[in-house]
Amino acid sequence: MPQLRLILVGRTGTGKSATGNSILGQKCFLSRLGAVPVTRSCTLASRMWAGWQVEVVDTPDIFSSEIPRTDPGCVETARCFVLSAPGPHALLLVTQLGRFTMQDSQALAAVKRLFGKQVMARTVVVFTRQEDLAGDSLQDYVHCTDNRALRDLVAECGGRVCALNNRATGSEREAQAEQLLGMVACLVREHGGAHYSNEVYELVQDTRCADPQDQVAKVAEIVAERMQRRTRLLAGLWGWRKFYWKGWRRGFSVFLGVAILIYLLFYRKGFGDQNNR
């Protein structure tokens, strides 16, 4: 039976869990309005759709600048990879209509760090609060927005956008799911039915074991080590940049001082010669 593996990504508070419930047609993920996120761990749920087994992975706060605090051991990041192995067919980047903020951009950067920039070719931008369009076209909204970061994101995703009203029920909710899953199915066919993969997913396949928790722990160690190595590399590059900039400023100051001194010497000499005449 063919599968559609989907991962809900984006910053916390955009309605990822509610979006997952809309796709699945029932309440599988805990979803509640509030300032404090309710999703604490990556969770997998599935449904049948048009002969496909659709598997949806809901994610907690692992796509923000607070990752060192929210997922210090990279356990939930590793769980996301394990649950979506051998790789997702699409990422659903969830954002709220009219509220694409700096936090959304930071979440996007985190998605690229974790999955690789190439994953944008497998990404669909999903806007929640479709009802706020009030009957207007989503395409017109995206085309006319003055939010440059949002326009760039949509372009990077090949224009794949969809809007959901997560309060919809019954036939309206199912029609929304049909539209989104149909878009994902077309995306999968464009890639010859193949799922997305990267080095981490290959490592997940190599660390398969009987106990899923043991596998998550092993993958978490690998991911944490990679992130620490990247942090050390960036710190080294930043230190070199500061050293270079400091040295350049010092050298420029010396050069400028010498130039001024030479100018003053020649200027005074020339001025004195004019007076002697």
Swiss-Prot record:
Membrane topology: Single-pass type IV membrane protein
GO molecular function, one term: GTP binding
Cited InterPro entries: G_AIG1, GIMA/IAN/Toc, P-loop_NTPase
Lumenal domain ranges by topology: 267-277
Gene Ontology CC entries for this record: endoplasmic reticulum; endoplasmic reticulum membrane; Golgi membrane
Main subcellular location: endoplasmic reticulum
Region annotation (G5) ranges: 165-167
Binding site for GTP: 10-18, 31, 129-131, 166
Family according to the record: Belongs to the TRAFAC class TrmE-Era-EngA-EngB-Septin-like GTPase superfamily. AIG1/Toc34/Toc159-like paraseptin GTPase family. IAN subfamily.
PANTHER family associated with the record: GTPASE IMAP FAMILY MEMBER 1 (PTHR10903:SF74), GTPASE, IMAP FAMILY MEMBER-RELATED (PTHR10903)
Protein name, entry field: GTPase IMAP family member 1
Native species: Mus musculus (Mouse)
